[in-house]
């Protein structure tokens, strides 16, 4: 059973993403050849198969595309946070890129106030020395 917080592993192709998150910056990987944005970061472009890539910082503004309130929590480690909202958000700069993260500023007694289409802003939750996870605040 998983009883500790699951931490993403850092790979060579997503190291800059995690470094930027630790600096409270959200960035999206682009192909260095065809300039196609992609998320999650990966080693090779799915469009042209180039291994070249660049990074573009984004505003952190997003729209709630979907969400779930897991009941009971998915893992025992999340018991203290329960109930909580996990959102699938669409970045304003990229209508085809969606990220998953916890929505952190909704009181537990008011979880029903969240709606698809709500405007959100990124925030970052420091997990350890290397990892800060993007999470979301309702505007």
Where are these regions (language model features)?
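Short, cysteine/histidine-rich loop/knuckle motifs that typically chelate Zn2+
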Residues: 30-33, 47-50
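Short functional micro-motifs and their immediate structural scaffolds
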Residues: 39, 53-54
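Residues immediately within or flanking Cys/His clusters that coordinate Zn2+
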Residues: 25-28, 42
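Conserved hydrophobic positions within beta-strands
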Residues: 62-64, 103
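Short aromatic-glycine-enriched beta-strand elements
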Residues: 74-88, 131-133
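Short, conserved beta-turn/loop elements at beta-strand boundaries and strand-helix junctions
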Residues: 67-73, 94, 108, 127
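Short, basic/aromatic beta-hairpin or loop at an interaction surface
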Residues: 88-101
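Well-ordered alpha/beta subsegment
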Residues: 100-139
């Amino acid at each position: 059973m998983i009883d500790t917080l699951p931490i993403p592993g850092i790979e060579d192709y997503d190291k800059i993403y995690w470094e930027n998150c630790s600096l409270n910056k959200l960035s999206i990987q682009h192909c260095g050849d065809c300039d196609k944005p992609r998320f999650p970061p990966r080693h090779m472009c799915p469009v042209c198969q180039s291994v070249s890539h660049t990074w573009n910082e984004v505003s952190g503004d997003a729209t709630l595309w979907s969400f779930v309130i897991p009941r009971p929590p998915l893992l025992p480690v999340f018991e203290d946070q329960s109930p909580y909202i996990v959102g699938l958000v669409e970045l304003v700069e990229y209508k085809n890129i969606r990220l998953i993260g916890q929505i952190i500023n909704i009181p537990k007694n008011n979880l029903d106030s969240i709606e698809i289409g709500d405007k959100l802003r990124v925030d970052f939750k420091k997990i350890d020395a290397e990892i800060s996870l993007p999470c979301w605040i309702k505007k």
